[in-house]
Amino acid sequence: MDSNTTSSFQDILVRMSKMQLESSSGDLNGMITQFESLKLYRDLLGEAVMRMGDLHLLQSRNGKWREQLSQKFEEIRWLIEEVRHRLKNTESSFEQITFMQALQLLLEVEQEIRTFSFQLI
């Protein structure tokens, strides 16, 4: 796992948590939860690629891993759209920077997950 990506995730999550404290938006809490879930999934997939012998373990433990992968891509697309929507509607420069960084991070993570999944297939 790239240490820059890890620190980016942590930075985005901290920033979103601060924004959540300043607003009453429950939607932001959902985004934070999905970001955390996505980070864990990406990390697990990356570890499986690093230990290619785990591919068989991954497949036997979760026979529906392709469905799970598809679901994660749907979540990424939803998060990208949600971040874009919030970016268009915010006037706070702190929030704009946070959402721009979140969007960039989501695109990077989507590419990483695609790369990992192709290596596993």
UniProtKB/Swiss-Prot annotation:
SUPFAM superfamilies reported for this sequence: Nonstructural protein ns2, Nep, M1-binding domain (SSF101156)
Any one GO biological process: exit of virus from host cell nucleus through nuclear pore
Motif Nuclear export signal per UniProt: ranges: 12-21, 85-94
Localization, UniProt: Virion; Host nucleus
UniProt KW keywords: Host nucleus, Host-virus interaction, Transport, Virion
InterPro entries linked: Flu_NS2 (IPR000968)
Gene Ontology CC: host cell nucleus; virion component
Main location group: virion
Keyword Transport among record annotations: yes
Miscellaneous notes: Average number present in a viral particle is estimated to be 130-200 molecules.
Primary role: Mediates the nuclear export of encapsidated genomic RNAs (ribonucleoproteins, RNPs). Acts as an adapter between viral RNPs complexes and the nuclear export machinery of the cell. Possesses no intrinsic RNA-binding activity, but includes a C-terminal M1-binding domain. This domain is believed to allow recognition of RNPs bound to the protein M1.
Subunit structure: Interacts with protein M1. May interact with host nucleoporin RAB/HRB and exportin XPO1/CRM1.
Family statement: Belongs to the influenza viruses NEP family.
Protein name (record): Nuclear export protein
